[in-house]
């Protein structure tokens, strides 16, 4: 009985301390309530869009474009990625606040140890308990998580459940033969060979971009939108990350950061990848989140561009994806096509392989597994392999 009374007494003291500290931290309850509301709303909209695709389609066509033309337009005023800066800032604040919490808890424990002659009530009335400090800190973290989850949902998550681009434009994929795939690969090889001499190259024979790639990507997407109405709308300029190594170590060529509605790409990678990647990320700003469709849209956008470097980027990127598919389907057929690629394109492929190989390791493998899980959680059953499904769309569209 005495033990139970002691436990109840301790719980009462902790509750009293939290109440006392709660008067000092007046916004504790408000933070918890706001965080819970935001998390519940996020879950509600994600479930609703998954159960009712027509809601997701309506949202993508009528609500999401408002965010792109307002917040996306605002963030586009800055030459750097606002989301990148925001993420670095939040990480810095998180680490600093955690260190401050730990230091404060240690100081309180030491202070109470030195003032052992005072009564418990006297000590608790002077300073909050470590539990109260931790609760206050966690409430702030929870609020930030709630805000980010809600922003992710309204600026990205719902779009995962909209109708696909192929459905919107009546492109029907089918089970094609190896011969059909081989014909596409031959066509792409011929296109690469005919354009390889039209791009600028450095002393090592590696492609260089002609002009700022961001403007070229916007122009390419706007040109393609004249043919496909689902792509019409405002496009902010895509941006290279200030620290592109963050993406390199994750084996990522680009990323759509929904918190500020920005398309970002890896500025360190081989130049031929950049136009294709910039258009890929911009396609997400039209609400098409499926990776294979973003790849296909980027492919079409590069082909529709007036710039030689964009055309070359599109054809060579499409060539890589389709040739990889042919390699898996029929090695002999792959060999027949592979030897017809001009030697002038080889430096680009070699530089690309060398670049990604230099970052291959535990970090990139872990990041790829995380990305795979993320894509599967958002309805892309094949995970990171879904990027390769653009081949199905290319064959269906051009055969």
Give names to the regions the model predicted.
Residues 289-333:
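Post-HExxH zinc-binding segment in Zn-dependent metallohydrolases
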Residues 87, 94-100, 132-166:
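Transmembrane alpha-helices and immediately adjacent membrane-cytoplasm interface residues
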Residues 344-399:
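Pan-zinc metallopeptidase signature
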Residues 79, 276-288, 292-295, 299-300:
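Active-site recognition of the HExxH zinc-binding catalytic motif
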Residues 199-267, 271:
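Auxiliary, metal-adjacent structural segments of Zn-dependent hydrolase domains
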Residues 157-229:
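Membrane-interface segments at or immediately adjacent to transmembrane helices
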Residues 2-3, 7-27, 104-135:
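Membrane-interfacial, low-structure loops and terminal tails that flank and connect transmembrane helices
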Residues 41-108:
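Membrane-embedded alpha-helical segments of integral membrane proteins
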